[in-house]
């Protein structure tokens, strides 16, 4: 009886150990400003970046009379375009590359992804 319980406990221990083993992430690194413009995107400084499925995004789109449809990914809120080339630009919020539509002067921008840029 003790051998059976010992075997079960040992098996469970190794199963939990295997489940807790760290696996490296395979996410691609964020794009840079030059990669953004190469794909036809615009570099923006957004006060907030939300998942498209966030109810706040749907509420804001509804208030603006925008029909977004089934979109996925990130949506920038209250965004201002910034130039990759030249000085004087700064972004104290989230720097993103947006390849989708820009609504209401940057209040809502779809198709955004975070980028690394030194401003």
From Swiss-Prot:
Point out the signal peptide segment. Answer: 1-22
SS bond list: 36-97, 45-91, 46-79, 98-112
| Highest taxon of the lineage | Eukaryota
Where does this protein reside within or beyond the cell?
Secreted; Secreted, Cell wall
What InterPro entries does the entry give? Hydrophobin, Hydrophobin_CS
Question: Recorded GO terms, molecular function?
Answer: structural constituent of cell wall
Major location category of this protein: secreted
Provide this UniProt record's keywords sorted from A to Z: Cell wall, Disulfide bond, Secreted, Signal
CDD domains in the record, alphabetically?
A: hydrophobin_I (cd23507)
**What is known to happen upon mutating residue 51 to E?**
In strain: Horst 97
Cellular component terms, GO, for this chain's entry? extracellular region; fungal-type cell wall
Q: Which SMART domains does the UniProt record give?
A: HYDRO (SM00075)
What is this protein's function per UniProt? Aerial growth, conidiation, and dispersal of filamentous fungi in the environment rely upon a capability of their secreting small amphipathic proteins called hydrophobins (HPBs) with low sequence identity. Class I can self-assemble into an outermost layer of rodlet bundles on aerial cell surfaces, conferring cellular hydrophobicity that supports fungal growth, development and dispersal; whereas Class II form highly ordered films at water-air interfaces through intermolecular interactions but contribute nothing to the rodlet structure.
Q: How does it assemble?
A: Self-assembles to form functional amyloid fibrils called rodlets. Self-assembly into fibrillar rodlets occurs spontaneously at hydrophobic:hydrophilic interfaces and the rodlets further associate laterally to form amphipathic monolayers.
| Family according to the record | Belongs to the fungal hydrophobin family.
What's this protein's name? Class I hydrophobin 2
Recorded source organism is Agaricus bisporus
Q: Which gene encodes it?
A: abh2
């Amino acid at each position: 009886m003790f051998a059976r319980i010992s075997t079960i406990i040992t098996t469970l221990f190794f199963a939990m150990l295997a489940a807790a083993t760290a696996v490296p992430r395979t996410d691609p690194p964020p794009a840079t400003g030059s990669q953004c413009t190469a794909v036809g995107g615009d570099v923006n400084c957004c006060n907030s970046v939300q998942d498209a499925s966030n109810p706040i995004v749907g509420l804001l789109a509804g208030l603006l009379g925008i029909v977004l449809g089934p979109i996925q990914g990130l949506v920038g809120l209250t965004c201002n375009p910034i130039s990759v080339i030249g000085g004087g630009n700064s972004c104290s919020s989230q720097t993103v590359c947006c390849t989708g539509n820009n609504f209401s002067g940057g209040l809502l921008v779809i198709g955004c992804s975070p980028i690394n840029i030194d401003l």
